[in-house]
Amino acid sequence: MPADIRIVPCLTDNFGYLVHDPATGATASIDAPEAAPLIAALDKEGWKLTDILVTHHHGDHVGGIAELKKKYQCRVHAPHDANAKIADADVRLQEGDVVRVGDLTARVLETPGHTLDHLSYVFDDDRALFAADTLFSIGCGRVFEGTYPMMWESLLKLRALPDDFKLYCGHEYTASNVKFALGIEPDNAALQARAKQVESLRAEGKPTIPVTLGEEKQANVFLRADVPSVAAAVGMPGAPAAEVFGEIRERKNNG
């Protein structure tokens, strides 16, 4: 049976996610920005939390773990090299591991850059990618701990997934990301279409995710650093893609 996925707004602009297996009743939270909204969503659905899948150690992604674990006695799956930072972890994960949530399965991808321990979770059967702060809609995370080449390789790993996968990211940053991207690719038709869609969704108070990876590949300038016209637009024709990506990320940092 397909997973039931619920988007749970948390904190100021974080997304929490509940992934429920209707066949077994198992439910996973992808990260735990804060406990109260997730508990409310679980209560509304009549679900019990069985697992938390942590993407990285930043406080706005793990702040609710202790309370949720105490309430539900759920298993906490966390990056293998975040041991000292996520003390509540029961299972340590690395590239190629598989997490089972009831009858659902998630592949673990290491996607370092934003942090060195960052993981993304791929639910192949449900065509869902939970990329947290590696890949945003029309954006990507700041590179706090890694390097620009490292982050670019992580983005390439996610870009290689099929177009029909849906992206579930860590924050509602899409409107500001669109504004920035249009400054580099004002004539990108896919980006223009996404901009209109985002404006409409936000006007209705709706989240801008999920979005398909196919759409992101056409409209997200951070995934397009190896496109010659993008390199030219930032004054780096012929430069290596990782360097072009770094320039785009620096512009976003300073914008």
From Swiss-Prot:
GO terms of molecular function: hydroxyacylglutathione hydrolase activity; metal ion binding
Cited InterPro entries: Clx_II_MBL, Glyoxalase_II_hydrolase, HAGH_C, Hydroxyacylglutathione_Hdrlase, Metallo-B-lactamas, RibonucZ/Hydroxyglut_hydro
Known catalytic reactions: an S-(2-hydroxyacyl)glutathione + H2O = a 2-hydroxy carboxylate + glutathione + H(+)
Classification via SMART domains: Lactamase_B
Enzyme class, first EC level, given as a word: hydrolase
Keywords, sorted A to Z: Hydrolase, Metal-binding, Zinc
Pathway: Secondary metabolite metabolism; methylglyoxal degradation; (R)-lactate from methylglyoxal: step 2/2
Self-association state and partner proteins as the record states: Monomer.
Protein name, as recorded: Hydroxyacylglutathione hydrolase
Organism: Rhodopseudomonas palustris (strain ATCC BAA-98 / CGA009)
Lineage: Bacteria, Pseudomonadati, Pseudomonadota, Alphaproteobacteria, Hyphomicrobiales
